[in-house]
Structures are given as C-alpha cells and as structure tokens.
C-alpha cells in the first residue's frame, strides 16, 4: 500500500516521501497488566483500556486522503480511517494487543471455497444497516467491487488484485458503462465470487476497504456518484462520515443504526472523532505537545516533537516506535532512463548512509540492500546487488564504470519527483543530488501535492515521460503479509494502468510475471520470491533505501490505544480509541 507519508506503507503507504520515518533505539517496554502508559506500550498491548463512552477524539493530518471513497483509496492511513465508517466481508481483529488476524466482519464466518480456490462464498449477517437505516445487502457488496472495474473513474485504489482474479469479460468496464458482472452471484443473504484463476489469498481481498458495500440503488445520493462518491461516502461502520470540507477537515459521528452485536472487530467508545488537516508540520507538533490534539492520523511526528521524545523521558512514555513492514525506495524510470547501465550508475552512486540520515537517521530504520522487507517471504538479510561500499556511502568507481557502459561517461541530467508538503523529502533530494553529482549525474526536483502524487503524477506512465521524471521517491508496504501481497501491485506487468498505476516504472519482466502469476495457486515458494527480488534488482528500477520504523505520539488522555499492525506501519487503531468520556 502507499505509505503516504507517511510518508503504509505502506505504507505508504504520504506522500510516501513526506513521511517522518523516525524511531528510537531503546528496547520495547510491553504494556503492563493495568495498561499503563510506557514507551512502545501500544505496539503489542493496549494503553489505558477503558469502557467509558463519550467524548471527542481530535486527530491531525498534514494532507487530505487521496480519496474517502473506499474503492478509490490506496494510502495506508486512509485505509486505517476507513475502519471508522466502512465495513467489509472480513476484517482484521486485534484482541488484547495481540497480532491482528483475519476475522468475519459483515460476514457470518470466514467463507467457503472450492478445492481449487476459484469459487468463494460468504453469508452476510442479519440486521446490518447503513447510517440512513436501510439494509446492507449482498448486492451492495457486489456493486462496490464492480466499481473497481470502472478504471476510468475509480483509478486510485487496489483494483489490480480484483481485476486479475475475478472472472469478467475483457470489455467489462464496471457498473456505470457495463452494468451487472455475472461472475459475482448474490442471493438475499449470500455472495459468490467466481474467479478466473485459483487464488488462495482471496480472503485478504475481502478484508480490504475496497470490498466495502456501496448502495447499488442510490450510491452516495444525488450528485455523489462515480468520481464524486468520496465526497459523501455512505457509512456502514460505527461512525458516520460528515461535515467534510476538502483539504480542511472531516468529522465522524456515531451511527445510530450500527449494532455492536453484529461487529466483533470494533469496540468504539468515542462519540465523535474529528480530523483537522494542517499542512504546517511544526503546528502539528505544537498542538500534539500542548495536548490540544490527541494524535496524528497520517504520519510520524515531526522533527520538533521527535527531539522532545528522544530527550525527555516524560514525553517518551507517550510514544511508540513500531517496526514496519514497508520499504522506502527510489523508483528509477526505464521509460526516461532507458539504458540499464545508466540506471545502475544511480544505484552505485547513491550514498545510502546520507539518505538514511536524511530520512531521520538510524532511528528511521535499517539500510536496505534489497526490496523485500524482513517480514515478507523472499527477504534476505545479506542480499545487496549494488553494494554501496563498507560504509554505505556509494561506490563511485562502479558508478563511473556503469556510465561508460551506458555511453554517458560524463554523466547525464534527469528529474527527481517527490510529494509535498514534506519536511524530509527536500533533505533526501539534496543528499541524492550531492551523491550523484560526484559522477556527473545532475538532477533537479519536481513536485506534486500528496493528494495527486501517486494517482496522476508518478501513477501515470504518460505523465512520467511527459515530465521527464527519471527518479521518484516512494515507499511501499504489503497490502497483505505475503510475497504476492508485497510485490504484485508494484511489479506485475499485467497490471499497468493509465492512472493510479502503482507499478511506477511500468516493469514488465517475464521472470517476475511468471512468479506472480503462479503465486495465487500457491505454487510460488519463498525461494521464488527471493528470485523475484533478485530479478527486479537486475532490472535496476527500484533502489531500496531502508526498511522503516515509525514514531507516533498519543495524548495521555486517550484510552484503548493500540497499533493497527494489519497496516504496514502500525498507526493507532482509531476506531476503538476513546477519551475517558471527556
């Protein structure tokens, strides 16, 4: 997933480049039996457990979501916020701070499948209702997923998984232009998916926000359909999406038609959760420090609050530093830098030691020699195809040799893209610029607002070429914890789309494609994903920088605080957070 940001990624899933990947080197202190606050207490525990209801939780973010449409969002923090007002057939449940597991949400159980994983059937619970009191039906779940096929309208979410697995005519363009999709069969209480290929991980798709129901009869109401649905999405969860002012604020108030008896995943206690969007990172830090805001919804803390956390034990007890399953990297575009040796020159010349420092120092994460993070199949702790030397400052000699091979012995010029606002991305750019200049590669910066960076700036292959973007900052976390969940969206050549493309370099390598195509059948092993990682590195399109950690801060007044580790970067699970009724 995209790590906005967060800087998900993924996360991430951010702009991915806007994220403050900061952490602390102190050992983790587990939550005590009483749930008392301590450093890292929310990572694998629950801080201040409470059943007291009422109050308003006050959240901040530096940018708006890429979309509030559940089918059209791909930022990890926005997936986390979707848990407030949308539900899906399945979801992630975290009991008493344990690791999250898949669990039924709208469905009565985990569903059933046939022997070859090509047919999946789920039964909906009775008594499920939207915030307007109307029934949630299997047809609504079907309609929401059909919307993913309307890629001319819904082009920012994880549609590639669904398009690659659910059987459909080649000319099916979603419900707006093509109507009903016959391969998804519904009754009054069940929904059946007929797939075009075996897919043993299908339950993970049913836990995505993209599987949330959308009322097929009215969608978002008059004027809020298609691309505008994200301005007024219908609520199926415990909170109602309301008072939305784009790029400024949104509120979530209790859904009187939601029933705790139908929801074993969420246990909300707050009356209201307010999100204020503030592009001033220092202002966000100040509000968190002063206690006028409760937590940041999208990113790590900024540099000012980070310093306080690292130096003041009284502040540190209210912070958490989860290790995250995402990789921060630079995408080197073969459509702009066409010669593989020219791309390799960038890999060798990059000063990873300085890049890690620019991202927040050693507390930001561990320098990466390959793309696959430690928690995902195919990871190798020793892989490092483009060695940056013993001190990770780059191998200038090898970079110059690669430039000779690509016919550019004196270097070349290109552009580096990143999302704004960001405290760190300009520092990362400056570090990269200095390192590449050592071998004659000259770079200039080009930026885009975080809200459009992934969808239409680097998410558009045509725009990459038109803008001459040779390098783009990004970060990625697994959409679900498998090799396929990490790699498919960023490396499968079959899933390249005109906008909202997450395979930023438009990689279409037959070796990579073959492994990914075999994965849904359960035929790709850890060794295969190790081979995939090696092949991607040979293609020199993804330059891994670090495996990340994040630093978050929670207001001491908050209750029921725990990390949502189902996402790539451990943000707090805000749906269950309270204020002790205040």
Where are these regions (language model features)?
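N-terminal lobe/hinge region of extracytoplasmic solute-binding protein
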Residues: 58-115, 234
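Extracellular/periplasmic solute-recognition and catalytic clefts
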Residues: 155, 242-253, 262, 274-335, ...
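Gly/Pro-rich hinge or "lid" segments in bacterial periplasmic/extracellular proteins
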Residues: 94-97, 198-267, 272
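Structural transition elements
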Residues: 239, 363-405, 420-427
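Alpha-helical secondary-structure segments
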Residues: 58, 136-146, 188-194, 198, ...
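Detector for C-terminal structural segments
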Residues: 245, 350-381, 424-434, 460-582
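Bacterial lipoprotein signal-peptidase II cleavage site
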Residues: 24-33
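Surface-exposed binding/hinge segments that line
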Residues: 123, 142, 147-150, 154-218, ...
């Amino acid at each position: 997933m995209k790590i906005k940001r967060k800087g998900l990624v993924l996360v991430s899933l951010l702009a991915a480049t806007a994220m403050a990947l900061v952490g602390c080197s102190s050992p983790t202190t587990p939550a005590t039996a009483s749930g008392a606050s301590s450093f890292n207490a929310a990572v694998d525990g629950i801080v201040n457990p409470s059943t007291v209801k009422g109050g308003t939780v006050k959240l901040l973010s530096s940018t708006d979501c890429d979309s509030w449409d559940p089918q059209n969002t791909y930022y990890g923090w926005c997936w986390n916020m979707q848990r407030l007002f949308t539900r899906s057939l399945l979801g992630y449940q975290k009991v008493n701070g344990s690791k999250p597991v898949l669990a039924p949400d709208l469905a009565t159980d985990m569903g059933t499948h046939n022997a070859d994983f090509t047919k999946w059937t789920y039964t909906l619970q009775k008594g499920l209702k939207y915030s307007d009191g109307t029934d949630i039906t299997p047809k609504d779940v079907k309609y929401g997923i059909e919307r993913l096929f309307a890629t001319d309208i819904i082009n920012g979410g994880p549609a590639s998984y669904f398009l690659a697995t659910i059987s459909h005519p080649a000319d099916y363009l979603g419900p707006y232009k093509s109507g009903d999709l016959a391969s998804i069969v519904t009754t009054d209480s069940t929904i059946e998916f007929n797939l075009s290929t075996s897919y043993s991980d299908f339950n993970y798709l049913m836990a995505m926000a993209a599987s949330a129901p959308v009322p097929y009869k009215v969608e978002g109401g008059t004027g809020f359909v298609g691309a505008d649905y994200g301005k007024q999405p219908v609520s199926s969860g415990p909170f109602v999406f309301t008072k939305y002012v784009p790029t400024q604020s949104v509120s979530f108030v209790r859904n009187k038609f939601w029933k705790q008896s139908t929801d074993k995943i969420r246990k909300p206690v707050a009356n209201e959760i307010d999100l204020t969007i503030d592009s001033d990172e220092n202002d966000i830090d100040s509000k968190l420090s002063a206690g006028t805001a409760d937590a940041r919804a999208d990113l790590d803390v900024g540099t000012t609050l980070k310093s306080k956390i690292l130096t003041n034990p009284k502040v540190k007890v209210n912070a958490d530093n989860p290790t995250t399953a995402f990789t921060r990297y630079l995408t080197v575009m073969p459509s702009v830098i066409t010669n593989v040796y020219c791309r390799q020159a960038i890999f060798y010349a990059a000063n990873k030691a300085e890049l890690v420092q620019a991202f927040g120092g050693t507390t930001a994460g561990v320098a990466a020699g390959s793309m696959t993070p430690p928690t995902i199949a195919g990871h190798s702790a020793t892989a490092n195809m483009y060695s940056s030397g013993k001190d990770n400052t780059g191998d200038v000699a090898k970079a110059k040799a690669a430039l000779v091979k690509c016919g550019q012995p004196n270097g070349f010029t290109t552009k580096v893209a990143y999302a704004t606002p960001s405290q760190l991305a300009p520092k990362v750019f400056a570090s990269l610029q200095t390192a590449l200049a050592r071998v004659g590669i000259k770079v200039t910066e080009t930026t885009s607002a975080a809200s459009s960076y992934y969808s239409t700036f680097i998410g558009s292959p045509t725009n990459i070429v038109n803008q001459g973007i040779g390098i783009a900052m990004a970060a990625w976390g697994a959409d679900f914890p498998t090799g396929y969940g990490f790699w498919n969206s960023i490396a499968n050549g079959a899933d390249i789309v005109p906008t909202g493309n997450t395979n930023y370099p438009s990689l279409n390598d037959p070796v990579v494609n073959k492994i990914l195509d075999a994965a849904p059948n359960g035929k790709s092993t850890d060794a295969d994903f190790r081979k995939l990682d090696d092949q991607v590195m040979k293609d020199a399109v993804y330059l891994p920088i670090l495996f990340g950690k994040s630093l978050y801060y929670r207001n001491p007044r908050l209750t029921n605080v725990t990390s949502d580790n189902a996402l790539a970067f451990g943000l707090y699970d805000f749906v269950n957070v309270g204020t002790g009724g205040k």
